[in-house]
Amino acid sequence: MKYGRPFLIALVLVLAASFSGQSHDPASTSSAFALQKPSAPVPLLAKGRPVGWWVVFKLNAATFPDCGDGTRGCPFGGTVKTYKDAQQYIFASSESPTLKQGSGCAGDTDTDPIGATFGQVYNGSFNYLIWNDQFYDDPVIKGCTKECGSPWGHSKGLLAWNDAGNGFVMQVSTPSWPAAGNKAHPRKTDGDSLGCIKDDDVMVSQHFFALTLNKNDVVSVLKALGNASVVTDPSNPQIVNNGGPQDIQQLVKGLGVRSSSKKFLTFNLSGGVQLISKPSKLNVPPWQMVSAILGGVSLRAATWWATPEIATTTASTTVKCWDPSLSKPGAVEIATSGIWNGKKIGLTGGASPDHNHAKIGVSLAGPKNYSIFGDMNQQGSLSGPNCASSQNGRGGLFYVVSNPTLSKSVKALITGDTAPQ
């Protein structure tokens, strides 16, 4: 069969587009790109449902035990434990910023945000970094037994990225999870599924926050982690698979050491989220520091509030454990209870089911409508004599989301009793 010149030109253009990954059909473009190069890991509400960010608040075992109608499982290793368990959860996202009840067991399915987001890394081939000050010796961290105390950072999370440097960060408040980034390098003595590990980190409330990152954001997060002295081991493939752009690789290699920094860092990430990094040697009360960095905004925070407690403060409270690099903080209320679905929930620290290990905060007034997801508890000292006490003497990260709908929803969750001044 004989073809004319216009047809041959068109055929050449179609073939060229196919090999270059370009097409006028968006679905074809996506398929061609996927064949050439793995897409970036992203926050997922469920398998196949990417979002810019999500936040999960796992409820406590006293008020919302077990998984509701869900059945507990161990998709990332381990065995279902018989300890006090609560894997009911509420969540919000960039797609729908109002907190709502989730279904199933948090972290154990591909239809919940935690399980779906972590699963793409654990069962995939991405680069990853895990840090946690409470690995409980699996993996073993040189110089630490069971956990790494002060002056190591009080920080936990997962960073995952592709070879172009794009990916996501997931901040967690859970001790001993996650502690293995891929099924090729599982934990040696424990599981890696919520509710299926030796430590009961699903009895009290916990929080999880995941955020989409571009390559520059990944660099910023790594600088923030280094400044905060996070606990990791770049030489151990169980928790680090280093790759991608050279500047990212170099920053990863430099982690797992204690920083000498006394300077807080702030980064404006591409998704509109602000990141704050507190170094361990900046010996100030953590949430007063956040208030000051955000312009003296008044905050309400729910953390593991336990000895040595930092009391509720007003804008006129004297804070002697302070640094000249910081402006004056606003009021910081300590939430000791909240409410969900008409039920009161405990928001203090403690070793019984009606307690809280999440670290979340919200602005109380002003135009910014901040929701804050942090690494650090309100434990330490306002005015000494030991200004390096507890969390004052440790590092950590805070993610600040400015969204009026989310802020209203978080504020409602932690509205309740307040610690005295």
Labelled PLM ranges:
Residues 9-17:
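Bacterial N-terminal signal peptides
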